[in-house]
């Protein structure tokens, strides 16, 4: 490898929150090696978050979900053809370095497919799947002070001589005018004022044990609307609309129900919030990345490792790991603290 890499592949396939947490790696690489070509390999579903990112030269999307779901001979043949095309594309890029930020077997296989002579990943004890170490040539153990996952990702840059102090990571996200305009139109239509005591609630989560009970979200929304004079907007994702409606269905004044949102529109919503309330989810980390104060609700996952990154946030962690152990009053108090009462 030359003293300064010519082409670097970042492999962080999913999910939304994890991709957000890895963004500072691209920023740090772009600052350290401004002439290097930076390419991010990511799942198709999360790719929109990275399109037009100022630190990246290219985004390559893959569909590992389709790889895993192939059952018929025709589907398998299509997957194989796609993998051959992907491998050729990666080899043609002539990567000097590939960095596996995910630590899985599938991410390791993609990292290996880049053909990069230097393939950096986590040491076996830090990888999510131990066999991931088979695909990397340089394995890193993050320092003790790197408690947050963002800082652990940045530790993977040490073999390249790049260092970012814990807590000093930088986030940037591309903005898209069309998405911003659609959300502006929605706000006007429902009478919401951006950043004016606007509390955005995100009741969903990828795992059921990371979800705060719907009844608690509803009680919080009612107190915010009726006692705190706050505006409340409830987000929802696939299969979550009924949950959001149950939270919105309170006596007037009631929360607004968000429209269906893609990733660009979700980012636009979080930019307009005064505070985001959510569990350990992608929308929470997206809000933190755009600079919106967050109230994070944590049960089975570590708030020290996975909490909203940066200053100005509040975290409530259930001592027994159960989301139902977090009651409404302390969450309300945390929101009011952020709002300035």
Tell what function each PLM region has:
Residues 1-341:
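Catalytic machinery of carbohydrate-active enzymes
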């Amino acid at each position: 490898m030359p003293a300064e890499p010519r082409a670097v592949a970042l492999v962080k396939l999913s999910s939304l929150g994890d991709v957000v947490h890895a963004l500072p790696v691209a920023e740090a690489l772009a600052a350290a090696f401004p002439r290097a070509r930076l390419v991010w390999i990511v799942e198709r579903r999360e790719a929109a978050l990275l399109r037009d990112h100022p630190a990246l030269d290219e985004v390559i999307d893959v569909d590992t979900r389709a790889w895993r779901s192939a059952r018929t001979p025709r589907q398998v043949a299509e997957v194989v053809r796609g993998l051959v095309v992907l491998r050729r594309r990666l080899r043609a890029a002539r990567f000097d370095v590939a960095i596996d930020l995910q630590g899985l077997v599938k991410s390791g296989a993609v990292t290996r497919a880049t053909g990069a002579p230097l393939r950096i990943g986590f040491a076996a004890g830090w990888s999510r799947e131990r066999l991931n170490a088979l695909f990397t040539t340089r394995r890193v153990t993050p320092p003790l002070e790197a408690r947050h996952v963002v800082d652990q990702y940045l530790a993977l840059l040490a073999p390249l001589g790049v260092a970012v102090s814990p807590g000093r990571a930088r986030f940037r996200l591309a903005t898209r005018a069309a998405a911003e305009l659609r959300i502006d139109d929605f706000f006007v239509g429902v009478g919401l004022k951006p950043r004016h005591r606007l509390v955005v609630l995100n009741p969903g989560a990828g795992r059921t044990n990371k979800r705060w009970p719907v009844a608690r979200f509803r009680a919080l929304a009612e107190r915010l609307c009726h006692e705190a004079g706050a505006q409340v907007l409830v987000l929802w994702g696939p299969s979550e609309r009924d949950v959001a409606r149950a939270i919105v269905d309170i006596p007037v004044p009631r929360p607004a129900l968000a429209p269906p949102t893609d990733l660009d529109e979700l980012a636009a919503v979080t930019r307009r919030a005064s505070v985001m309330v959510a569990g350990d989810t992608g929308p929470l980390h997206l809000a933190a990345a755009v600079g919106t104060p967050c109230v994070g609700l944590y049960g089975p996952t570590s708030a020290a490792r996975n909490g909203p990154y940066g200053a100005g946030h509040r975290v409530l962690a259930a001592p027994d790991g159960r989301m139902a152990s977090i009651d409404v009053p302390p969450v309300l108090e945390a929101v009011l603290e952020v709002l300035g009462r």
